[in-house]
Amino acid sequence: VVNDELPVVDGVVPLPDWGVFEEEELDGLTDEIRADLRAHALSVPPLVAAGPQRLHDERRYEVPVTVISSTMPEAVLRDLMAKGHPYVAELAKVRDVTVVELPTGHWPQLSRPDDLAAAVVRAVDGEQDAEEAMAVPT
């Protein structure tokens, strides 16, 4: 389940009101960006957010993963993984996890698009050192 607490309106899950989000999740979003996001956001069927995800191939844990974390510092993420928090239970099982911090809100593609693009390119290029992978201004 991605988020079964999102409100269903007229049979779909729309982009919620901004008040639903923690203030940190909205970091970097100007009023103009928020209006543009709302104008272009598409509603999704309820099961997209609330339906169970069934994964069965254990080989997925052998695929290296890069997490570009915009709302949570690496230390907090790794602590949650170590403690078995359900939010990151699947991630904690992955053998090789690289975390790249990109401090901003939930939508880095809108608040820091150039920095996000640079971090993705570095991750795809196989950059394993988080500091080197995030060699962009913060």
Task: List each model region and its residues.
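Serine-dependent carboxylesterase/thioesterase catalytic core
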Residues: V1-E22
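Short amphipathic alpha-helical segments, especially helix-boundary/capping motifs
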Residues: V9-P14, D27, E90-D96
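Generic structural signal of hydrophobic/aromatic residues within well-ordered alpha-helices
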Residues: F21-E22, L37, L91, D125
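Active-site rim elements
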Residues: F21-E25, T104
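A contiguous pocket-lining binding segment that forms or flanks enzyme active sites
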Residues: E24-H40
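Conserved serine/cysteine hydrolase catalytic core
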Residues: E32, L42-P103, W107, D114
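Residues within well-ordered alpha-helical secondary structure of globular protein domains
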Residues: A39-S43, R122
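Catalytic active-site module of serine/aspartate enzymes centered on a nucleophile-bearing elbow/loop
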Residues: V94-T138
